[in-house]
Structure formats: C-alpha cells, structure tokens
Amino acid sequence: MTTESDTVTDPVTTPVLHLVMGSDAGMAGGTDTTAIIADVDVYSLDSLNLSRVRGLIVNGNCDQIYLERRREILTDFVANGGRIAVMGHPLTDFLPDLGQWRKLQYSGPKDLAISAGSPHPVWEGVDPVDLSFRREVSGFYGRGYSQKLPDTAIVTNYIGRAGLPVDYVYRLGRGEVLVHGGIDLSVYQYDPNTSSRVFPQLLAWLAQGDGTDLR
C-alpha cells in the first residue's frame, strides 16, 4: 500500500531547483526565470524526484538541521553528477567537505571588499567592485569567510584586507559544489552593472547546458 508520504513527486520540468523555506525565498526575492528554475519547499526534499534535475540552489535561509538529516540525498545527487550551489552561511555538515563559515571582523569598506580569485564561469565578466558595493553600501555580498576548505577547493573570490575565501567550488564524486558565503546571488540579477551577470551565469552553470541561455 502506498501512502501519500511514500509517493515520489512527478519529475520536474526545470533543470534547476531552488530550495526555499515554504513560500519564503528569503533575501533572494524569488526569480522569474521560470524556464530554467523553480522554487521548491525544502521540506519536500524527501519526496522529490531528482532524476531529471541537474542543479540545486540551497537558499540561505533553509533549515540546515533538516538538510543535515538528508545529507545522503544531497550527497548522492552530487556524486552522481549533479551540481549544488549553497548560499549563505553553512553551519552544519549537510554535504561532505563543506568548509566552516566564520563571521568577519570589520570596521570599514576595505574590510569587506571583494577581490577575484581563480576564474570561473559563474563570475565571468563580473567586476569585483560591483560586488563590493551595492546601492553604494558595502557588505551586501558577504560579511564572513570560510575556513577548513577541502584540499581540492578552488577559491573564486576573496573578501577583506587579508584575502579570505568567500566563494569556492570543489568536486564531489562526478559533480560539483559551489559555496557562496553571503547574500543569495539572485538579488543581483537586476542591478545596473556587471554584478547582474552572476545569477544567470550561476543558473547556466547549474543547468550544465540544459536550458535557456539567460545571459
């Protein structure tokens, strides 16, 4: 006998899913790029059919204790070739090799300035100055850094005078994990500068060539 709780949902029609807390997309404010991404309640993760999904975005306000209890689902997804982008401040080990987020001690804009690291398609053509200041205010992009990164991690952006990692990518099995230790990157999609490239390029990277080119 199959109960409602045992039922796996039908395959989704978008290559990327955005895990959010219920109807609350947090700072992300949702997205209108419906051809490639759909918002999904994180608490439905157990019943999702991920067989046709290529990428997941974990919203910065998601329940990380719940995610840690579903670590096997997330790990299998990446190990089998999927890609996950983690937004915000990872504080639990819901994926293998996640670095530890730490709050940055800062006193001014230079302590929060973003500088480019290794090249990556998500940040292609993006001026770090446009990430460092949003609406003439510093600190939107991030106010912390990550430590204890896996040996294979590639740091794509640094923060502050000391050049501490704020964004990094690492391989896990046949897939990849991208971690952005700050505000959800979708907030930049309508900004009037090069930072608007980040979110569509993130979606293109997560979709792995399956979906509309949003750049």
Model regions and ranges:
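A glycine-rich, often tryptophan-bearing local segment used as a flexible ligand/cofactor-contacting loop or short
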Residues: Q64-V137, V198-Q201
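Catalytic beta-strand/loop cores that center a nucleophilic Ser/Cys/Thr
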Residues: S5-T13, M27-A35, L112-S195, G209-L214
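A short, compositionally biased domain-edge/stem linker segment
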Residues: M1-V8, V42-Y43
